[in-house]
């Protein structure tokens, strides 16, 4: 109460002294006097919590100039038609019209090492309506909840630059040497404004992946494209060669079988007759015939020791040799279930395509295949893991010595 009573006394004393009285601020200042002309940024983004009680304007018609998408004006808006801002081109400014009053003559000069030419340039820009239109497009946008970093006038920033650094520096040369990944995959939204290099289109793949200057990169890419094209052509020829092949047992076109898993060929190693994998495996698993009859071809009776599963039909010798080599390499990486890391015995011996390895990684030495009907006393024992052959030999020697002593 004492402070409130002292306020009128100060006003009367100031008036009596011949000075203009200070305005008395009300206890509750009116809300929305000047803020009603400022558009609420939270309302623009649809997250204003105040609603009708907000002191800022919720009328979008009064802020059309602030709703123009600045990325669209640069030509690189990623949202396109889904952008919440307007995609309108900026209006042409009247070069003769003045948009603001002339600046005061008592314009304070900026401190520091700023020459008079930079100051005159700044004053002329302020007199003609401020910085250019494109500078406002590149201005920093204020986002609620983030720190605002202002931008100094262009003339002030250029005034402190040395004469030899006044020209615009080019883009990073390392970036210019790199190809744009977006242009290489199809389309770059930045177009000519992209900082990366857009390559020349390749005649084989149609992508912009050829470096305009690097001849080594161009030749390497063209070589890889030709190799990929040759593989695609080989695949096309293989499909064309296999689509009309008929199985010699079921007499059905292999590629037209109802079950997709049965559309595979069983290639015999020493024969060129065509069979589907299911039929030839069923033929070779019969028990009522001899082994020689089972392993022979149903048509020409030529014996084949194994069958190669294949998705495509192979008839030429060179192609069949490649297929057999790939098949053996693939099987050699899998462990044999009969050998079972040395705990079992494989009936195929050294002719087995699967991997015979012990738990410690040692590979079994090739053993001759066990013939059926051979007596067990003539079988060659296969080494197994966990057996100490030194102790086994010493036990046999002791047994023989005891037998001799008993005879004596």
UniProtKB/Swiss-Prot annotation:
Catalysed conversion reaction: S-ubiquitinyl-[E2 ubiquitin-conjugating enzyme]-L-cysteine + [acceptor protein]-L-lysine = [E2 ubiquitin-conjugating enzyme]-L-cysteine + N(6)-ubiquitinyl-[acceptor protein]-L-lysine
SUPFAM superfamilies: CCCH zinc finger, RING/U-box
Enzyme class per UniProt: transferase
GO molecular function, one term: zinc ion binding
Function as written in the Swiss-Prot or TrEMBL entry: E3 ubiquitin ligase catalyzing the covalent attachment of ubiquitin moieties onto substrate proteins.
Protein name in UniProt: Probable E3 ubiquitin-protein ligase makorin-1
Organism field: Xenopus laevis
Chain ranges of zinc fingers (C3H1-type): 34-61, 63-90, 174-201, 330-359
Coiled-coil ranges from the UniProt annotation: none
A Pfam family annotated for this UniProt entry: zf-CCCH
The gene coding this protein: mkrn1
């Amino acid at each position: 109460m004492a402070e409130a009573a002292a306020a009128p006394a100060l006003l009367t004393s100031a008036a009596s002294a011949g000075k203009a009285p200070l305005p008395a601020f009300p206890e509750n200042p009116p809300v929305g006097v000047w803020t009603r002309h400022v558009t609420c940024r939270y309302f623009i983004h649809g997250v204003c919590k105040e609603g009708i009680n907000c002191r800022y304007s919720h009328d979008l018609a009064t802020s059309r100039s602030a709703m123009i998408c600045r990325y669209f004006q640069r030509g690189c808006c990623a949202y396109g038609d889904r952008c919440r801002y307007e995609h309108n081109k900026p209006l042409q400014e009247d070069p003769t019209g003045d948009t603001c009053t002339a600046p005061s003559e008592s314009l304070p000069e900026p401190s520091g090492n700023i020459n008079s030419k930079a100051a005159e340039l700044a004053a002329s820009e302020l007199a003609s309506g401020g910085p250019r239109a494109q500078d406002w497009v590149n201005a920093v946008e204020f986002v609620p909840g983030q720190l605002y970093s202002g931008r100094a006038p262009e003339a002030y920033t250029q005034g402190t630059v040395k004469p030899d650094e006044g020209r615009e520096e080019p883009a990073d040369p390392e970036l210019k040497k790199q190809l744009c990944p977006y242009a290489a995959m199809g389309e770059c939204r930045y177009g000519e404004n992209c900082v990366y290099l857009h390559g020349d289109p390749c005649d084989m793949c149609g992508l912009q992946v050829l470096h305009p200057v690097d001849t080594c990169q161009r030749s390497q890419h063209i070589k890889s494209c030709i190799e990929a094209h040759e593989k695609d052509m080989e695949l096309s020829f293989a499909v064309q060669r296999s689509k009309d092949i008929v199985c010699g047992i079921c007499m059905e076109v292999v590629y037209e079988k109802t079950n997709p898993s049965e559309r595979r060929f069983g290639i015999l190693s020493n024969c060129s007759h065509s069979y589907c994998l299911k039929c030839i495996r069923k033929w070779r698993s019969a028990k009522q015939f001899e082994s020689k009859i089972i392993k022979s071809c149903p048509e020409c009776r030529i014996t084949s020791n194994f069958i190669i599963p294949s998705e495509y039909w192979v008839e030429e010798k060179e192609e069949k040799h490649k297929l057999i080599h790939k098949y053996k390499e693939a099987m050699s990486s899998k462990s044999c279930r009969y050998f079972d890391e040395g705990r079992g015995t494989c009936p195929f011996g050294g002719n087995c395509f699967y991997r015979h390895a012990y738990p410690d990684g040692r590979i079994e030495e090739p053993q001759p295949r066990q013939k059926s009907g051979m007596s067990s006393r003539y079988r060659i024992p296969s080494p197994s893991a966990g057996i100490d052959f030194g102790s086994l030999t010493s036990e046999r020697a002791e047994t023989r010595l005891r037998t001799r002593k008993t005879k004596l």
